[in-house]
């Protein structure tokens, strides 16, 4: 059985991170490139949002006794295989897991323009993940 308190807490954190990113989504590329603190804030907040999704997915996988994921990317594949996530969202979240690995392990090669582009693209996917999990688990 899924530990609903853990999931609710992680969903609340994810909601906060999405709101924080939403507040910055209209920043222009020129401003983004010129403001090192803003870039780092957005990078870190994107990282935390993806970590929240991974935590939520990991708890569901563990609690439901689903197959053991091979890596972070595979965590979302497991949820997709089990019907928790639609196929297109699963693919997008798997890419986010790859992005997370770059932020954590290969941060020296981060491209600021790529980060800016990710900010512009992922908010809807993060929201959809949150709503899908809430609906699937009956959380209002």
Named regions from a protein language model:
Residues 1-140:
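Solvent-exposed interaction patches of small proteins and small membrane subunits
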